[in-house]
Amino acid sequence: MNRYNVYKNKFGTGYILDVQTDLLSGLNTRVVVPLLSISDSPKLAKYLNPTFEVKGQEVAMMTQFIAAIPESELTNQVDNLGDFHHEISSALDMIFSGF
């Protein structure tokens, strides 16, 4: 598994972003955040919900819906958002630290 890989959401609409460090690759779960199309997203909060383009669609990171799922559920990788490390880390800092 690679941090910041984006997978098709098998459980619903949009995508799933893997945000877990690769240093914990021995676990059988991954920490993930949903990526929803802007039209399907609740009101976006500055810093908490950065937006990205995935497969030509603008999506928002729904940081407030962070979860852990079995690693085996992450199949069908469609993208990697590693170039947006700062924005993703800032959103995670906002949910955990408030800044």
What are the roles of these predicted feature ranges?
Residues N2, D18, L74-V78:
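Residues at structural and domain junctions
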Residues R3-V6, K10-P50:
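Compact nucleic-acid interaction/catalytic patches
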Residues G56-F99:
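C-terminal terminal-subdomain/extension
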Residues L44, N49, V54-Q57, Q64:
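A short, structured beta-strand/loop element
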Residues M1, N9, S89-D93:
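Generic detection of intrinsically disordered/low-complexity segments and helix-coil linkers/edges
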